[in-house]
């Protein structure tokens, strides 16, 4: 796999930024919702806590054994770990970016069962230990682009999805891959209460075309920064598809089903005019309510300090994945 020439050393986000509790800090500072209407400079000053030294420590995950293939390394400085695991979207635990870190400790990730079924010759069931032992793990430094026009760069640890699917032996009828998050309302407050969970229909579901799922970039992710994923980042296993918007990266997966027909996806069901099935990062196709031409890269400074940077087509992975969409109108199929 060719190194991604679009990544610069300044693009990768550092370990000290990953596990923040934003809501608690804002309350401690007495910052009200009205304060968030202040001009940009005031935002940067008020939210300078984002680069402070009094952040809670990152949760201690289990250390993982993994390789570091040169093609995925780039020797780049990393997005701080406390920001990557402290600034999250995981609506099952609340709508605020700090809610997942504050609330996801209730999720029991061991024991765990992941089933692979549908249009396969050999259905599989993996347990918690299989996720980290059955396949060789490798660290990959990937860009991550949220549909909300912010981005990070993260050293994920996992294995290519195509290796798992190959074991199940997809049949000739398989055209799509459907994913499903665990449904556990007793552990996930957003699944109990529509107000907490943003009014989405749960369990969260996602999908890919089979060729997208089989692409070498598509990663079943079990760790970050050398350790097992924390719950707020989708433990024990989540999907990373680096050329797509982050909401395609379904978390805490319990089911993978190969299908003949295109599967439903949560955000497309909720707002089909705003969130397409493909969700490829594209600076030329705006969200109906904001531009996608630029993005706010979250690094080691204050969250509103940083300069906006141009959004790259396919999040900088065009050389690797553009051929998947040859002849497809990316504006219509957003």
Swiss-Prot record:
One of its GO terms (molecular function) is metal ion binding. It catalyses: L-methionyl-[protein] + a quinone + H2O = L-methionyl-(S)-S-oxide-[protein] + a quinol; L-methionyl-[protein] + a quinone + H2O = L-methionyl-(R)-S-oxide-[protein] + a quinol. It is an enzyme of class 1 (oxidoreductase). The keyword Heme does not apply. Mo-molybdopterin binds at residues 88, 91-92, 146, 181, 233, 238, 249-251. Its cofactor is Mo-molybdopterin. Disulfide bonds: none annotated. Its main location: periplasm. The keyword Metal-binding applies. GO terms for biological process: protein repair. Binds 1 Mo-molybdopterin (Mo-MPT) cofactor per subunit. GO terms for cellular component: periplasmic space. Its EC number is 1.8.5.-. InterPro entries: MsrP, OxRdtase_Mopterin-bd_dom, OxRdtase_Mopterin-bd_sf, TAT_signal. Residues 1-44 form the signal peptide. PANTHER family: PROTEIN-METHIONINE-SULFOXIDE REDUCTASE, PROTEIN-METHIONINE-SULFOXIDE REDUCTASE CATALYTIC SUBUNIT MSRP. HAMAP family: MsrP. Heterodimer of a catalytic subunit (MsrP) and a heme-binding subunit (MsrQ). Belongs to the MsrP family. Part of the MsrPQ system that repairs oxidized periplasmic proteins containing methionine sulfoxide residues (Met-O), using respiratory chain electrons. Thus protects these proteins from oxidative-stress damage caused by reactive species of oxygen and chlorine generated by the host defense mechanisms. MsrPQ is essential for the maintenance of envelope integrity under bleach stress, rescuing a wide series of structurally unrelated periplasmic proteins from methionine oxidation, including the primary periplasmic chaperone SurA and the lipoprotein Pal. This is Protein-methionine-sulfoxide reductase catalytic subunit MsrP. It comes from Escherichia coli (strain ATCC 8739 / DSM 1576 / NBRC 3972 / NCIMB 8545 / WDCM 00012 / Crooks). The lineage of its organism: Bacteria, Pseudomonadati, Pseudomonadota, Gammaproteobacteria, Enterobacterales.
């Amino acid at each position: 796999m060719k190194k991604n020439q679009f990544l610069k050393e300044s693009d990768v986000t550092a370990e000290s930024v990953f596990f923040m509790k934003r809501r608690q800090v804002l309350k401690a500072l007495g910052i009200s919702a009205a304060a968030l209407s202040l001009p940009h400079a005031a935002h940067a000053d008020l939210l300078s806590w984002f680069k402070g030294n009094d952040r809670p420590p990152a949760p201690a995950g289990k250390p993982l054994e993994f390789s570091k293939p040169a093609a995925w390394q780039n020797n780049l400085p990393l997005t701080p770990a406390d920001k990557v695991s402290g600034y999250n979207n995981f609506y099952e635990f609340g709508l605020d970016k700090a809610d997942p870190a504050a609330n996801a400790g209730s999720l029991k990730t061991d024991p765990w069962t992941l089933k692979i079924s549908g249009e396969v010759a050999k259905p599989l069931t993996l347990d918690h230990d299989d996720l980290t032992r059955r396949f060789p793990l490798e660290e990959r430094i990937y860009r991550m682009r949220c549909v909300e026009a912010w981005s990070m760069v993260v050293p994920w640890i996992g294995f290519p999805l195509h290796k798992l699917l190959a074991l199940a032996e997809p049949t000739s009828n398989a055209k799509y891959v459907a994913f499903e998050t665990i449904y556990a309302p007793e552990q996930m407050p957003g699944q109990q209460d529509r107000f907490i969970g943003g009014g989405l229909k749960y369990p969260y579901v996602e999908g890919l075309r089979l060729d997208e799922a089989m692409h070498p970039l598509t990663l079943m992710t079990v760790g970050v920064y050398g350790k097992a994923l924390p719950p707020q980042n989708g433990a024990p296993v989540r999907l990373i598809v680096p050329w797509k918007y982050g909401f395609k990266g379904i978390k805490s997966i319990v089911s993978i089903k190969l299908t003949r027909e295109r599967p439903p996806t949560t955000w497309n069901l909720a707002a089909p005019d705003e969130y397409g099935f493909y969700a490829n990062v594209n600076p030329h196709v705006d969200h109906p309510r904001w531009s996608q031409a630029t993005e706010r890269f979250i690094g080691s400074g204050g969250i509103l300090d940083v300069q906006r940077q141009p959004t790259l087509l396919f999040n900088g992975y065009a050389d690797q994945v553009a051929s998947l969409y040859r002849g497809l109108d990316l504006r219509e199929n957003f």
